[in-house]
């Protein structure tokens, strides 16, 4: 469990720094799981046919009869076998879940859904769980309050996790509690960073989505969405991996634990099961909890700001419409700013549809600029950095990992708007990286103001052998006495 870090940055939501949304791309987490070549199905059919012929011949030798009699006898045996299998299928119970599993499933599904728990930071050290309960009960029904304490001293760490019964109440808590004064301190409130999405690899590539779904739903409860990635060159086959979304973290972790067991197989394959990096959501940070702007895409050409204002003002007061120029001088997107966040939330409800001149618009909440640095597919405007997520146990009793955590080799670094100088943060404004040829033939890069002359390469230090080659005759040991005067200035090199 990691300690919370105080972050006193403030977000300027009126600053108009905008950037265009790119097409969202699924994170590539599967390079090591893709095979280079597929075995030819025809070879398998031939092999099976040859094996069947050998089996018939062996059977005929054992019976001592001719081949026609043997084939008739095999056909009769097959008919009997099919009848027996059909009878067995009819006798199977409708569900493989026993009473113990059914009770466990009910418990997992009774826990609050994903997105119903909030993180509260910046708490005074003398605040107890009852104080937090009194603070949050005014907002809505609480499922659980967990104040994080030091394991050794038992003192409060200054942050807590509060699980509400529903996601709507959790969102309301973020709006009301973030930046609120509580017992003399300004507290922070954002969604708790738990995971509810699994990546599953090494799936048989001939499986259909229905076959895969049946197996996954038998493993555990709470499956909400299954995305089995299809092979683009052959739609009858999959690429060997999938993403599964669960009702909450507890359901996801229950299934994960069962599937990583060495005895669990997918048609003989041992699956790879890890937490998937979630698709970004505008509600996942304290800064985003204050967003009052919409990102609107597919705006027809020559659409005026007055048309957009008239379209969206039915949800509340619109303070301004911003339509920045896009790439190549064309613009098909814009930002609608409301006076209240509640108006923006109403505007993005699933029941709302928008059209201009018969063309449907895409409307979502805008994102702060800081979040876009880690999500190149997002759409954003100026904002300051937000607190980092925290690793903590969830109310389901299972350990959770933070969103975007680098784990299992699946994390993919986000893009940055400018190069990073390791250990020094972002590159200073106005500077650029300039290539420079080093004496040993390698190419290095240095920071330099634009228009400045190329930086000179540092002089190459003579090698040890070169220093000894200055005098003729004698061994290197003898000649080294000539350089005793300089030995004191040389760095000691043990190897």
Swiss-Prot record:
Gene: LIF2
Annotated RRM domain residues: 116-194, 196-278, 292-368
InterPro entries named among the record's database cross-references: Nucleotide-bd_a/b_plait_sf, RBD_domain_sf, RRM_dom, RRM_dom_euk
Subcellular location: Nucleus; Cytoplasm; Microsome
Pfam family, one: RRM_1
SUPFAM superfamilies tied to this protein: RNA-binding domain, RBD
Protein name per Swiss-Prot or TrEMBL: Heterogeneous nuclear ribonucleoprotein Q
Region (Disordered): 1-101, 452-495
Described purpose of this protein according to its UniProt entry: Transcriptional activator that binds DNA on GAGA-like motif and 5'-(C/G)ACGTG(G/T)C(A/G)-3' consensus motif in the promoters of target genes. Component of ribonucleosomes, which are complexes of at least 20 other different heterogeneous nuclear ribonucleoproteins (hnRNP). hnRNP play an important role in processing of precursor mRNA in the nucleus. Required during flower development and for cell fate determination.
Tissue occurrence: Predominantly expressed in vascular and meristematic tissues. Expressed throughout development in seedlings, roots, leaves, floral buds and siliques.
GO terms for cellular component: cytoplasm; endoplasmic reticulum; nucleus
Assembly information from the UniProt record: Interacts with LHP1 in the nucleus on a common set of chromatin regions.
Organism of provenance: Arabidopsis thaliana (Mouse-ear cress)
Disruption phenotype: Mild early flowering phenotype, reduced rosette diameter, abnormal floral developmental homeostasis and altered gynoecium growth determination associated with indeterminate ovaries growth. Production of ectopic inflorescences with severely affected flowers showing proliferation of ectopic stigmatic papillae and ovules in short-day conditions. Repression of FLC accompanied by an increase in histone H3 trimethylation on lysine 27 (H3K27me3). Altered expression of several genes, including LHP1-regulated genes.
Composition bias, Basic and acidic residues: 1-10, 478-487
Keywords carried by this UniProt record: Activator, Cytoplasm, Developmental protein, Endoplasmic reticulum, Microsome, Nucleus, Plant defense, Repeat, RNA-binding, Stress response, Transcription, Transcription regulation
RNA-binding as UniProt keyword: yes
Record GO biological process: cellular response to jasmonic acid stimulus; defense response to bacterium; defense response to fungus; epigenetic regulation of gene expression; innate immune response; negative regulation of innate immune response; positive regulation of DNA-templated transcription; regulation of cell fate determination
